[in-house]
Amino acid sequence: MLAALIPVSPLSNVKSRLKEFLSSKERIDLIKNILLDTYEKVKSCVDACYVVSKDDEILEFSKNLGIIPIKEDLNTKGLNEAIEYSLNIIKEDSVLITPADVPLLKEENLESIVKKSVENSVIICPSRGGGTNLLLLNPKNCIKPQFEGFSFLKHIKEAEINNLNIIKCHSFYTSIDINTVEDLGEIFIHGKDTKTYKFLKNLNIEAFPKHSSAGRFNIIRKSQ
């Protein structure tokens, strides 16, 4: 059986690189909308979906969606320890891990990825910056999670050390995560069917092409 695990940082620290553009409440609402989009895409591909966080608000929000909440132990430090803690609670044999900032996941991509999974394998989907935006472990404890930094290469190395079958899946939609204001532009181009897009539109945010080599988009917020 396959579970999905979505780690979420405490909402007090969420998406700090957007703080000059979005208020604290807006950043919290943004991550909730991305989480909702993520859950709607993964739920049909897995047997159960979990969220791990230290944040009671996000755990309650997740529970109301039908996601199983895991309250991080107070002694866990960082993302990787939170994931390891969760893997010892999750009852399913294998697990698909994806961060809560990947709003463009497509159900058809996930179905294709899940079908590739075999026993003693690791499926890795990189982010644009060399991180990992999706990691499918079969079985769930076959490697130690190595998120943060150039985690794509770290996960490959960890899988090689453990003599596992390594399956690399390069997908544009899976590679997009939201960390900066400019990243929001990808949602306006590729995510018009998402709740995240509707949320941003309701804030009167618009994206325009940038006609220079300095970036991809101009993201503006119209006065109401």
Swiss-Prot record:
Catalytic activity as recorded in UniProt: (2S)-2-phospholactate + GTP + H(+) = (2S)-lactyl-2-diphospho-5'-guanosine + diphosphate
Coiled-coil segments on the chain, per record: none
Subunit note: Homodimer.
EC number(s) from the headed UniProt entry: 2.7.7.68
Keywords: GTP-binding, Nucleotide-binding, Nucleotidyltransferase, Transferase
One GO term (biological process): F420-0 metabolic process
Organism: Methanococcus vannielii (strain ATCC 35089 / DSM 1224 / JCM 13029 / OCM 148 / SB)
Enzyme class: transferase
GO molecular-function term, one example from the UniProt record: phospholactate guanylyltransferase activity
Pfam families: CofC
Function in brief: Guanylyltransferase that catalyzes the activation of (2S)-2-phospholactate (2-PL) as (2S)-lactyl-2-diphospho-5'-guanosine, via the condensation of 2-PL with GTP. It is involved in the biosynthesis of coenzyme F420, a hydride carrier cofactor.
Family (UniProt): Belongs to the CofC family.
Annotated metabolic or biological route of this protein: Cofactor biosynthesis; coenzyme F420 biosynthesis
Stated name of the protein: 2-phospho-L-lactate guanylyltransferase
